[in-house]
Amino acid sequence: MGMYKYIREAWKSPKKSYVGQLLKKRMIKWRREPVVVRVERPTRLDRARSLGYQAKQGYVIVRVRVRRGGRKRPRWKGGRKPSKMGMVKYSPKKSLQWIAEEKAARKFPNLEVLNSYWVGEDGMYKWFEVIMVDPHHPVIKSDPKIAWIAGKAHKGRVFRGLTSAGRKSRGLRNKGKGAEKVRPSVRANKGKTK
């Protein structure tokens, strides 16, 4: 087995391998950090590389913390029955991974989101690492594998659900029977998709 295969096998079931102990120590530190943190190197090198990361200029790795569970809505100031406040049971129609990608994109408006992957979770939070690319960097523009991201069509791609997590959340992984209301979009089908 090559190095990447060993890493992949260890991350398949983190609690059973050495990764579990590492995550425990790491999360103690991560909880105290800001929501969006730029990191030097990917935590899961095998996953990052399979999703398009390269150790060259123009690529940035960002770790994002997202609160687990349903959406926490702001409390109304006006008077009404507590049952009519609309604070609970309104879940976002987005995955936590997609939300994490959007948080990263807002923090670094000059970069584009390429992809992301899970790196840990506890009872309250989930952590994702987001691979971001600088579309204006000469190294990126001259690399035929990633130069497409510099095109106008890919500007703000994460906010339009064009990343892998976004497409999955929109139901675009499915086709055929049961996926009639998925295309062309959720909005075009008046929200019947979800």
From Swiss-Prot:
InterPro entries: Rbsml_eL15_core_dom_sf, Ribosomal_eL15, Ribosomal_eL15_arc, Ribosomal_eL15_CS, Ribosomal_uL23/eL15/eS24_sf. PROSITE patterns: RIBOSOMAL_L15E. GO terms for biological process: cytoplasmic translation. It comes from Thermococcus onnurineus (strain NA1). One of its GO terms (molecular function) is structural constituent of ribosome. The keyword Ribosomal protein applies. Keywords: Ribonucleoprotein, Ribosomal protein. One of its GO terms (cellular component) is cytosolic large ribosomal subunit. Belongs to the eukaryotic ribosomal protein eL15 family. Residues 167-176 have a biased composition (Basic residues). The keyword Ribonucleoprotein applies. Residues 162-194 are annotated as: Disordered. PANTHER family: LARGE RIBOSOMAL SUBUNIT PROTEIN EL15, RIBOSOMAL PROTEIN L15. The gene is rpl15e. This is Large ribosomal subunit protein eL15.
